[in-house]
Amino acid sequence: MIRIAARNANRSTAIRSISTTSIRLNTTQKVVVTPPPVATEGELPPPQPKVTPPKATPPPPPKTKRFSLFGFLLKTTLLASVVYGGTLYAATKNDKVMDFVVDNRLPYHEELLELIETGSIDDLQQGLDQLKSKFGSVKLPSKEEIDELAQKLEHKGEDIIKETKKKFTATRTGTDLTPSEQLQKGVEIESVKKDVPHLPLIELNSELGSSVDETVKQTIASFNNFIQTIDASTLASKNDKLIASINFSISQLASKLNGLTKSFDEELQKKLKVSQTELFSSFTKKELELTENLLHQFTTEKQQLEAKLNEKLNQEIQASRTAISQAATNAVSMVRIEQTKNFEKLVTEKLNEERNGRLANLDKLNDRLTELEKFAEGFETQIVSNHKKALIQQAVSKLKSLLLAPAANEKPKSIKPYVDELSKIAADDEVLKLALKDLTPLLSNESTHSILTNAQLLSRWEQLAPELRSASLLPPNAGLLGHLASIVFSKLLLPVKGVKQDGKDIESVIGRVESSLARGELDVAVEEAANLKGWSRKLANDWVVEGRKRLEVEFLLGLIESESKII
């Protein structure tokens, strides 16, 4: 488009500009301000018209942002590309997403997945370098050539405008109105006459018209629009030659541009064919490599799956064998149990038949046998008890004879074997076990002559009596002289005849002990000796221990003998 901008005052051109794209005409009327008439003397000044200031126009409303279809399509395309690429990238990391992509057969998913998995920045750079090397020989018109062509067209347009401007005159019609009336009168717009002669338009040949670039066609259309605005009636006929030369130049320019375009297309087609052949061969090689890799992977996966399936099949076969074997064992066991039950039932029925027939009196015989068994068991228990009782009594009698009345001419013997034998015999009775438990410590280290008899205890007491008499005469805290005096004075004491029951002196105690030993009352004699006080009690301590030992042995043996009679 060619634009011409002009400011016209008195129908003359003030500013003119021509660009390579458009020409625009703008004309504005210059307002002529006339001075007010000078009033002469004696005359009234003319009334001045009241000028109202123009009202302030409100600011224009803000322009609303219009809907852009191109922006909407661009954003939608970018969003879809990001979602699609993210889905394919997630498919390489997740098997479920991969199954979704394969099942739905998304477009170009195989090529894009291969590019994501095997592609790299080096491969992308290599592909760009190959494209640059293939299309580098194709020569496009440079920016300088396009600018030069545009400048030529601009200069030719300026020349045409200058030639036409010389013939172009504008007439201005005056007016008889006063300045005040001119101010009050509105701006009049003159209508353009329709019947205006025009210059001949620029036209291309029919051969070039179909192959000329769209930009050239738009430039020619702009020139034609400009030519139509020029009034041909005021121009000389010699300008027709100028228009014809311009038409011829534009035709030559279009033909050259068409030739360049055709040569560029031919060269581009050749390069595309060569690149297509190379890409097809590389694609074939890549396809063969991928096929081999896929076959290798398929074979490997197949072998792994076969191994896993064989292992799983062997496990299932082994489990089935175990289950079948166990089921067979259970079935055989159940059959055996059932056969055993049937056999027992059959034997029971046969026994019942025999019992009801020839063995009708078998129950009575069985009852008699039961009674006989009970009698035999009771008799056997009684025999065992009597035998046990006899053995215990014999052992107790043997111990008594050895301990309480040993023979003077016999050698001393250990009592422990007799006590152990008695313990074995009386192992089932609790009373005997407790008695033997107390008797064993007493007799474990004793012999047949270590337990003193009543006569031996009496003779020892008689030997101890002088020492007791002398000890009773000792004063408290006596020294050597006190001991000698007690020995002398004890010789002077006369023995007491008879027994004094309530006497507390030493002679009464000695007499009661001797009397009790003579009667065989050892427990009374030991009690009297144990009640002594002071030094006399210490002197009689050994005799009291021996007496108590004999009393304990006699008591335990008597308890064992009594319990053996009760058994």
Curated annotation (Swiss-Prot):
Pfam families according to UniProt: Mitofilin (PF09731)
Region (Disordered): 36-63
Keyword check for ATP-binding: no
Compartments, record wording: Mitochondrion inner membrane
GO cellular component: MICOS complex
Coiled coil: 284-383
Keywords: Coiled coil, Membrane, Mitochondrion, Mitochondrion inner membrane, Transit peptide, Transmembrane, Transmembrane helix
Assembly, per entry: Component of the mitochondrial contact site and cristae organizing system (MICOS) complex.
Protein name: MICOS complex subunit MIC60
Gene: MIC60
